[in-house]
Amino acid sequence: MVMENALGLLAGEWEGEEAIATTRWGEGGPAHGCFSARLDLGGRALLMDYREERDGKAALQAHAVFTAGPGHDEYALHWFDSYGFAPAQPAPGHWDGARLVFLRSSPRGQTRHIYAFREDACELALESSFDGGVHWEPVMHGTYRRVA
């Protein structure tokens, strides 16, 4: 797949339901998520705004910048959220056939973002590891439908 086309799969307005796992960062439960994403810089970057609501109240907000690098299958994710964790470096990513997969690393551990696509739906799974990637814990799973 052409790299810009992979990023373009996320472009649009999306809404869906999420299942948040109980983790060391907080209680689990259902949530409603939505994101708006658009291509920029000639299709080499995707700008995303994400909002999560729990019990009808704003929970997590994030801004993300996805980029397609100069090399084949070279992607990066810059993630900024309302929890205050700014990235020291971008998360490297790759396209594995039907999914965009990114691995964020910080002193707190590692988090995988796995975006899977089908028709007009997108699934996002977040998983965290606190032992260098030996064991992974679910953080969130969301299924989103394109609304525009």
Region roles according to the model:
Residues M1-A148:
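Hydrophobic small-molecule pocket/channel-lining residues, especially in calycin-type beta-barrels
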